[in-house]
């Protein structure tokens, strides 16, 4: 007997911190300039999380709460949380587990 598994991404959320760090801000901190950075990376500004005590899982939580509000979901309906980050809150547990706990998605699986 063959079982066919079917999966679909039904929602995607995002969160961008309010604080901007521009290349001009970086010029004041290190020996660089806007032109040098833009010519090598194409980046002119980046967003940074400055609130004390906040971390990657808090940004992920905001993204999922956006989905929950828009789609009128119960957090228990969330089957899987995928989180990719180079700045985890801590090495273990995974950031996706922390996000799931914060939003009340108690039955989710995690992809990291």
Cite the ranges covered by each PLM segment.
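Short glycine-rich or small-residue beta-strand-to-loop segments that form or flank ligand, phosphate
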Residues: 79-85
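Short, well-ordered turn and helix-capping elements at secondary-structure junctions
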Residues: 13, 85-86
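Conserved catalytic cysteine-centered active-site region
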Residues: 38-57, 86-112
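Conserved active-site "lid/cap" helical segment
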Residues: 1-79
């Amino acid at each position: 007997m063959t079982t066919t598994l079917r999966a679909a991404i039904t929602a995607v959320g995002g969160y961008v911190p309010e604080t901007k760090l521009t290349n001009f801000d970086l010029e004041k901190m290190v020996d660089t300039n806007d032109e040098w950075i833009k010519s090598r990376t194409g980046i002119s500004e980046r967003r940074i999380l400055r609130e004390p005590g906040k971390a990657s899982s808090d940004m992920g939580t905001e993204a999922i709460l956006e989905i929950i509000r828009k789609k009128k979901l119960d957090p228990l309906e969330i089957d899987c949380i995928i989180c990719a980050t180079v700045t985890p809150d801590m090495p273990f547990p995974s950031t996706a587990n922390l996000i799931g706990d914060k939003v009340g998605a108690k039955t989710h699986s995690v992809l990291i």
